[in-house]
Amino acid sequence: GGLRDLHELMWTSRVTHGKATLKDLTEIGAIPERDAKAINAAYDFLTRVRNEIHFLTNRKSDLLSLDLQQQVARNLRYADTPEQQASELFMHDYYLHARRLHRLCETHLQRAAAKQEKTPEKKSWFSRSRSSSRIAPAIGGFVMRDGELDVADTNETLDGNRMMMAFSYAQATGANLSSALQETMQAALPSVNKTFRSSPEAAQAFLKMLRAKGRVAAGLRLMHELDFLGKFLPEFGRVTCLVQHDLYHRYTVDEHTLRTIEALDDLANSRSKTLERYRGVFSQIADTATLHLGLLMHDI
């Protein structure tokens, strides 16, 4: 996991920019320097992990199976702590790097696709060649461009409240965020600070999203993918990519939590007769924000 994301980015960059190295892409402004550094750090970590797997298995195997994780962790100088095993600490870092690499590569692939759409004369396998962009009227400073939410003013600097508004719109409409908006949000994450977290406006906006029956997990997952959720709720940030080798957690704690809320969304949207009783009980809850917040925090 992870390395193939980078390979795809490099292959695509050769087609769209004629460049196939991060250094070249940074120099022409295709990738911000901060993203290139994060990609390089993730690539370095994942390559060392793959090499350790090859050394331990004495063959070209890229499968990081459970029985190898503890020894790979030891070889990479991880040690047990009173709270966690070395393998859990190692896998936490592994998932962080793989997650970051996937998100960064996905963002830049979206940007490359958008660039190709704007220059249909340069047709390639990567271009969808739309004849024109479809733009919906602006609402609250945001617009819909070809089904993606974007800022109406491309020079706007977002703050925490504006980002919360964007997530709320995306949750309500089911729209994706444009690559440009995602990058703008990444740059604005420092504004998600203690002052913003403590504001009544932020609390009310977040609780409103938790009351959107059947759509809660989608909004939270989008927040999480862009690192907003962990900044807004530092307690959740601390369990991001947290691995627990026990009988209860097949996934990392953050993924386990989001899947739990997705199960509740599935119940709200279900028409199955076998779930009718549970759906009826759920429909009687006047304010589901407390329930969703409890699920969000149940493993913290």
Label the model's feature ranges:
Residues 245, 249, 255-256, 298:
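Histidine-centered active-site/metal-ligand motif
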Residues 14, 174, 268-272, 299-300:
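Structural motif corresponding to the C-terminal cap of alpha-helices
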Residues 16, 40-43, 251-254, 258, ...:
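Alpha-helix N-cap/helix-start motif at coil-to-helix transitions, marked by capping-box chemistry
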Residues 231-243, 256-258, 263-266, 270, ...:
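Core mixed alpha/beta domains of very large multi-subunit molecular machines
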Residues 243, 247-249, 272-287:
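Histidine/acidic-rich helix-loop-helix segments that form or flank divalent-metal centers
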Residues 197, 201, 207, 227, ...:
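Helical catalytic core of nucleic-acid polymerases
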Residues 1-249:
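Non-catalytic interface/linker regions that flank or bridge core catalytic/transmembrane domains
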